[in-house]
Amino acid sequence: MKETKKLGRFEKLARDVLISTSKMLKDAKIELFDGIHGRVLEVGAGIGVNVYFFNRPEVDHWVAVEPDRKLVDECHKMVADMGDRVSVFQGYLHELEEPPESFDYVVFTTLLCSVPDPDKIVKEAHRFLKPGGKLCVIEHIGDSFGLRAGFQMLAKYPWKLATGCNCRNNPVPALSQPGFWQDVDDRVELKTAPLRTKRFSPMLELLKPFVMTTLTKK
């Protein structure tokens, strides 16, 4: 029987941020994931919370990629009711042994802020998508002015040390690689994601604003 490791302090912080962020992004995820079907690849799946925003009967198979062993264990618990329609892979996207052009959808949520080479991740996602397949993205970006922008600048390095996340993230260059997407000539256009916020949270304020888009492979 596989040993399940307990979450450490930083893993608990990461899990709590994932859950809180997912609640805040509920409306955005319902909108973005509407229509997801077939074979779905999620990169940086964390504990698997996004599955609950899919129309699960329409998902033939969900492949989750997550490098953190402890989060993988949590993910297995989260999606146990989907049975053999789920594969949770502990590792990195470039290590995934799946055929090129074998997925109808690829999902990124708050991923590009925490990887060392966003361009490479987007290229790999593009490789796994079928022609006409869709990349669904929600990311947070660095604010451009005001108190939050200053706070993000001050917190950038300690926050990254604690969580692995760049709170001054800019996903546009990685997503805008030429020749990848239908109806994109130069730069990908990102839409502001709707947020649900019931009470002030300094941690979540640090991550705002959030943006979203769906890109279709040529």
Predicted regions and their residues:
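Conserved alpha-helix/loop element of class I SAM-dependent methyltransferases that forms part
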Residues: 19-39, 49-53
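Class I SAM-dependent methyltransferase SAM/SAH-binding core
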Residues: 41-42, 47-95
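A short acidic, Gly/Pro-enriched loop at the edge of an enzyme's catalytic core
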Residues: 94-106
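A short SAM/SAH-binding and catalytic strip from SAM-dependent methyltransferases
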Residues: 105-117
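A short glycine-rich, Lys/Arg-flanked "PGG" loop and its adjoining helix->strand segment in the class I
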Residues: 119-131
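Conserved beta-strand signature within the Rossmann-like core of class I S-adenosyl-L-methionine
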Residues: 133-140
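Short alpha-helix
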Residues: 163-181
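Core SAM-dependent methyltransferase catalytic element
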Residues: 178-179, 187-218
